[in-house]
Amino acid sequence: MFATRSFCLSSSLFRPAAQLLRPAGRSTLRNVWRRSIATEHLTQTEANSRLASQRVHRPNSPHLTIYEPQLTWYLSSLHRITGCVVAGTLYAFAMGYLVAPLAGYSLDTATISGLIQQVPTWIKVPAKFVISYPLTFHIFNGIRHLIWDTTKELSLKGVYRTGYAVLALSVLTSGYFAMI
Amino acid sequence: MLQTRLGLGALRQGRLLFAVKSFSTTSVAKIFPPPPQTIKGTVNDAAVFPHHSKLHGSYHWDFERIIAIAMVPQVMIPLFTGTSHPLMDAALACTLITHAHLGFESCVIDYFPARRFKKLSPLMHWILRGCTVLTLIGVYEFNTNDIGLTEGIKKLWKS
């Protein structure tokens, strides 16, 4: 009984499977493993020149256009811009004070003060605000950075708290200076 | 260095398995034209570490912070109380122009990097130094021949 059943199972299972797999397996292996690949030897100069030509076509990484507008990096950029504005004004005036007599002009305080007195008040008040705002913002944001150098307020909540404090203080101080 | 190159036979047989894709799928946005691509040495050269100096590191950082901290009373006292003195004006001029020079130097380093602008970067540094010297001379002339920095700003502001 047992011998008869095992003989039948082996004959029915293995002979058709072998017949089915043999030609298909051979053709698949023949197609997969046959490749025609050629290699060429390059000198160091040729390899470097090819790499350089490939690097010319690399795209830039996305940067300023994909970042979300946030108080953190806006104030940081504004700190540098306001610093350049205030320092540029000082540099321009000092170099102008040196160069103006060569052209026959004079940049002394009395002359400029006389010119400013001719401007009406309703122009001078907003102009004073615009002129003083870079200075006051740079002062308070600089103090903010000095506070960070002492490792205080360096959490995200602290950064935003000091950021809003700087904005409020600079607006109020510039408003006060505009009214003088 | 060996560079592999696929022949036509491989492309014909493996067309479905090895489809060629482009390097980037969006338009290439370039800010500046790429600089001349020069590769120094080979991949087998030893790594060269930058020169280690405290004058460019912690001492420079300390100097910047000392100037900034020294400027806080020198700017706040004339700005909010209006008092002025020739020596205070002289000290304010020195620290203010030093602070401005350090700030402009950071801008030159960031926007004219020496690796990319090999000739323009030293030129910009020397232009900045020349302007700083002229500014120092100009403010000295203003403080000595005119009424001084603090009194001058006050007079212009209240005119």
From Swiss-Prot, chain A:
Keywords, ordered alphabetically: Electron transport, Heme, Iron, Membrane, Metal-binding, Mitochondrion, Mitochondrion inner membrane, Transit peptide, Transmembrane, Transmembrane helix, Transport, Tricarboxylic acid cycle
Pathway(s) per entry: Carbohydrate metabolism; tricarboxylic acid cycle
Membrane-traversing stretches: 83-103, 123-143, 160-180
GO molecular function terms attached to this record: electron transfer activity; metal ion binding; protein-membrane adaptor activity
Record topological domains on the Mitochondrial intermembrane side: 104-122
Keyword Transport: yes
Any one cellular-component term (Gene Ontology): mitochondrial inner membrane
Residue intervals on the Mitochondrial matrix side: 1-82, 144-159
Cellular localization per UniProt: Mitochondrion inner membrane
Cofactor (UniProt): heme
Disulfide pattern: none
Binding-site positions, heme: 138
Pfam families: Sdh_cyt (PF01127)
SUPFAM superfamilies, alphabetized: Fumarate reductase respiratory complex transmembrane subunits
Assembly: Forms part of complex II containing four subunits: a 70 kDa flavoprotein (FP), a 27 kDa iron-sulfur protein (IP), a cytochrome B and a membrane-anchoring protein.
Stated role: Membrane-anchoring subunit of succinate dehydrogenase (SDH) that is involved in complex II of the mitochondrial electron transport chain and is responsible for transferring electrons from succinate to ubiquinone (coenzyme Q).
Sequence similarity: Belongs to the cytochrome b560 family.
Protein name as it appears in the record: Succinate dehydrogenase cytochrome B subunit, mitochondrial
Species name: Schizosaccharomyces pombe (strain 972 / ATCC 24843)
The gene coding this protein: sdh3
Curated annotation (Swiss-Prot), chain B:
Main location: mitochondrion
Molecular function as annotated in GO: heme binding; metal ion binding; protein-membrane adaptor activity; ubiquinone binding
Membrane topology annotation: Multi-pass membrane protein
Sequence intervals crossing the membrane: 66-82, 90-109, 123-140
Ranges in the topological domain labelled Mitochondrial matrix: 31-65, 110-122
Cellular compartment(s): Mitochondrion inner membrane
Statement: the UniProt record of this protein carries the keyword Electron transport: yes
Gene3D superfamilies: Fumarate reductase/succinate dehydrogenase, transmembrane subunit
Binding of heme, residues: 99
Induction (record text): Expression is down-regulated under conditions of iron depletion.
GO cellular component: mitochondrial inner membrane; mitochondrion; respiratory chain complex II (succinate dehydrogenase); TIM22 mitochondrial import inner membrane insertion complex
Pathway: Carbohydrate metabolism; tricarboxylic acid cycle
Transit peptide interval: 1-30
Keyword Cell cycle: no
Binding locations of a ubiquinone: 111
Mitochondrial intermembrane side, ranges: 83-89, 141-159
Protein name: Succinate dehydrogenase [ubiquinone] cytochrome b small subunit, mitochondrial
Organism this protein belongs to: Schizosaccharomyces pombe (strain 972 / ATCC 24843) (Fission yeast)
Biological classification of the source: Eukaryota, Fungi, Dikarya, Ascomycota, Taphrinomycotina
